[in-house]
Amino acid sequence: MSQWTPEYNELYTLKVDMKSEIPSDAPKTQESLKGILLHPEPIGAAKSFPAGVEMINSKVGNEFSHLCDDSQKQEKDMNGNQQEQEKSLVVRKKRKSQQAGPSYVQNCVKENQGILGLRQHLGTPSDEDNDSSFSDCLSSPSSSLHFGDSDTVTSDEDKEVSVRHSQTILNAKSRSHSARSHKWPRTETESVSGLLMKRPCLHGSSLRRLPCRKRFVKNNSSQRTQKQKERILMQRKKREVLARRKYALLPSSSSSSENDLSSESSSSSSTEGEEDLFVSASENHQNNPAVPSGSIDEDVVVIEASSTPQVTANEEINVTSTDSEVEIVTVGESYRSRSTLGHSRSHWSQGSSSHASRPQEPRNRSRISTVIQPLRQNAAEVVDLTVDEDEPTVVPTTSARMESQATSASINNSNPSTSEQASDTASAVTGSQPSTVSETSATLTSNSTTGTSIGDDSRRTTSSAVMETGPPAMPRLPSCCPQHSPCGGSSQNHHALGHPHTSCFQQHGHHFQHHHHHHHTPHPAVPVSPSFSDPACPVERPPQVQAPCGANSSSGTSYHEQQALPVDLSNNGIRSHGSGSFHGASAFDPCCPVSSSRAAIFGHQAAAAAPSQPLSSIDGYGSSMVAQPQPQPPPQPSLSSCRHYMPPTYASLTRPLHHQASACPHSHGNPPPQTQPPPQVDYVIPHPVHAFHSQISSHATSHPVAPPPPTHLASTAAPIPQHLPPTHQPISHHIPATAPPAQRLHPHEVMQRMEVRRRRMMQHPTRAHERPPPHPHRMHPNYGHGHHIHVPQTMSSHPRQAPERSAWELGIEAGVTAATYTPGALHPHLAHYHAPPRLHHLQLGALPLMVPDMAGYPHIRYISSGLDGTSFRGPFRGNFEELIHLEERLGNVNRGASQGTIERCTYPHKYKKRKLHCKQDGEEGTEEDTEEKCTICLSILEEGEDVRRLPCMHLFHQVCVDQWLITNKKCPICRVDIEAQLPSES
């Protein structure tokens, strides 16, 4: 710790620099932090801290020992490396606004026992938010990290960590990311806990690490004692209970709810052991190696999908807790993109409580559970985010907060005072820049105003850092957080991946920061090409992609306005690799104008493994986000694991809010070929939806923003590995492959368009050549399936020309089907054909013959499935043409008798009038008594006409009955099979 003392001073100086940028709130916290920084005693005392704190220290040290070049840090932390990593707790102060946590920290600092105080807070499980905050910070990696990050309060931990990381880290990082030194260059040498705590900050190039964050990293080599562990678990459980009670959080995310873990905190925390990897461009390399998943705090569940360095692949747990009670806990791998970095990601979403018990899981398995609780900032419908294990899906409630976070993330340091936002933003910027941006924009706009300019440069720095930041914990995304948070934390991880998207990030972050409204052009600069040596993600990540991101961010802007929508961001969470893609997510964030960050976050392919399939469907959730389809990484094949295509999942914001985490499975179903959506920079379209985003069940997604490569197809919900999780595929057929208008279309409109398309296709009857003169209504691909069935008509004894097909006939065909099978039995679309009304056209004479017979064929119910392979998608088909064709096709299905069979089984002859037996005696019988009618054409049989008597002895005109029998070999009257009667007929 003594080593850190100089660092502390240095950090303090940084802090001071930042301080001017920090809002009045932050200064207080900073003051206390300064106290800590100035007085290393707490750090020195840290060793006297409870074992838990020590554990954090050692753990952090261990974790980052690999990562950090800082030999000092390594020396300190190396001893307890793994254990410490596992146990290291970072105490992050919650924003003052959020909880007493930060103030606690301040008090502790004042007491010069800040660390101890924090430790104590952590140690003593308390239901109080303050206590829980601290305990969360300590016990819950996500808490502790994120709190520090999100807290406007200066993060002592940050300072400490940076100090620990030593000037070397400062030098190494050169803090270039943000002109501000206030972002402690977080070397990986920084104690692991420090990194974890600050992970977002770190890779955020410390940018995000605003002094705002109060984070105490206890670098003691002692492991956390059993008691402490129990306490942590207890605290988590309490928090979880409170969260559930309060916010009805998902079990997995409940732990963060009470804690109000900032998404950053969560996210950092989540990777606490594994990596507080704040991958800065500079620090990236350091962080990458470190962060063994094993080093994760017990409480932290690290999911390590990839063997690649755990670049700050924090799973983003965004627990956003605004001053109000809203907390969004988004636990998602912030895009497995991080995982591409190989950083393990803990899914905090599992709830702090679960973290402790949870073993590191493969990142793939990381689940993102985001619960959006009443978001204080946005209308914030509270959205439940269900997290797919594979797919982080967040149901973001729209929340300015998210934006603010994003802004904060970008601003990060820029507005310390909006520490919550700044930290959120930082986290967002780094991690879920796009998404956070969105949220931030709203909150930040006010808060981050000060930070805006700061945010800008910080963002800019962030942009480079952002990439690294990729993993930054998701900023607290109260509203949009699910999307952002997952995105932000991890998504930006793709930045960490060295994704060029950083610029996107930054753009999102800082622009949003300024105001979610601005469209941010990508800051191509900041390619920060994979500054971190992401083994999995070759540096090749092309920064160029960023531009598209930029564009997206623009669109994100658009979206943020919609951000009120409580969109599920579930798909967003999609860990699309193509983080870049969804940087644009700002558009993406339905909730957050700048949801793109959210998208980006997710996009960052939580699934490193399926890098190529960022699951662009990231849920396409924020259409905007989707807006930037950029499959940026495509150029970087090696990125494949890293591939951050965030295929912008444009699920339009219109996407049903109900759409849950993976809820929007079908919405992603569309695997638009969109192999690589053009980097549509600017999807201002509030809800551009990738075709594949059709995922929006509403089909609003009809706008397929340049879909990311199909691989991304993103089954946002589906495991990234699968490009198109089956869940999403369902919709795919509904959504036109072509990108429809960016604007949201009403589902019916979408269907209508599809219908038009379909009709065009159908205009080429497959068997038209086999048919009688084409009937306008018969121009259906299936038309040829059945020989033209002429419904018996009394008007003519000749086969009716197709054009003659009368309404009543149509009515019979359609009506019979409708009448026989209730709408439920019919294909959903058939119900749209209001066949029953047509029944009035039916003539009673025909009805008994036609309806019963046709009704008897179950095939009717399958007709709609489209034997030709096309299903009836159009909601309405004039004239029931579909039904008609189906009915005709039915004829083949029914296997009407062949002409040979008809001749063999029936008795054709010339009709001779004969008197009824009862009338034979008296000629007085009227002529009518002797008349017989063909029940098919309803014409009276004339002497000498060719008639055919069926085995059942019913008599019909040959022409009439032959037509019937070709379609159906049963008697039109009694429905007795002509062949079945053959033996008895003799």
UniProtKB/Swiss-Prot annotation:
SUPFAM superfamilies: RING/U-box (SSF57850). It catalyses: S-ubiquitinyl-[E2 ubiquitin-conjugating enzyme]-L-cysteine + [acceptor protein]-L-lysine = [E2 ubiquitin-conjugating enzyme]-L-cysteine + N(6)-ubiquitinyl-[acceptor protein]-L-lysine. A motif (SUMO interaction motif 2 (SIM)) lies at residues 325-331. A motif (SUMO interaction motif 1 (SIM)) lies at residues 300-304. Residues 164-173, 395-466, 551-561 have a biased composition (Polar residues). Residues 670-680 have a biased composition (Pro residues). There is a cross-link at K19, K28, K34, K47, K59, K73, K87, K96, K110, K173, K198, K218, K915, K919 (Glycyl lysine isopeptide (Lys-Gly) (interchain with G-Cter in SUMO2)). CDD domains: RING-H2_RNF111. Keywords: Cytoplasm, Developmental protein, DNA damage, DNA repair, Isopeptide bond, Metal-binding, Nucleus, Transferase, Ubl conjugation, Ubl conjugation pathway, Zinc, Zinc-finger. GO terms for molecular function: SUMO polymer binding; transferase activity; zinc ion binding. Residues 174-184, 508-522 have a biased composition (Basic residues). Residues 907-909, 949-953 are annotated as: Ubiquitin binding. Binds free ubiquitin non-covalently via its RING-type zinc finger. Ubiquitin-binding leads to enhance the E3 ubiquitin-protein ligase activity by stabilizing the ubiquitin-conjugating enzyme E2 (donor ubiquitin) in the 'closed' conformation and activating ubiquitin transfer. InterPro entries: RNF111_N, Znf_RING, Znf_RING/FYVE/PHD, ZNRF3_Arkadia_E3_ligases. It is found in: Nucleus; Cytoplasm; Nucleus, PML body. A motif (SUMO interaction motif 3 (SIM)) lies at residues 382-386. Zn(2+) binds at C934, C937, H957, C960. Residues 66-106, 120-191, 248-277, 337-373, 389-471, 506-561, 610-646, 659-684, 696-719 are annotated as: Disordered. Belongs to the Arkadia family. The SUMO interaction motifs (SIMs) mediates the binding to polysumoylated substrate. This is E3 ubiquitin-protein ligase Arkadia. It comes from Pongo abelii.
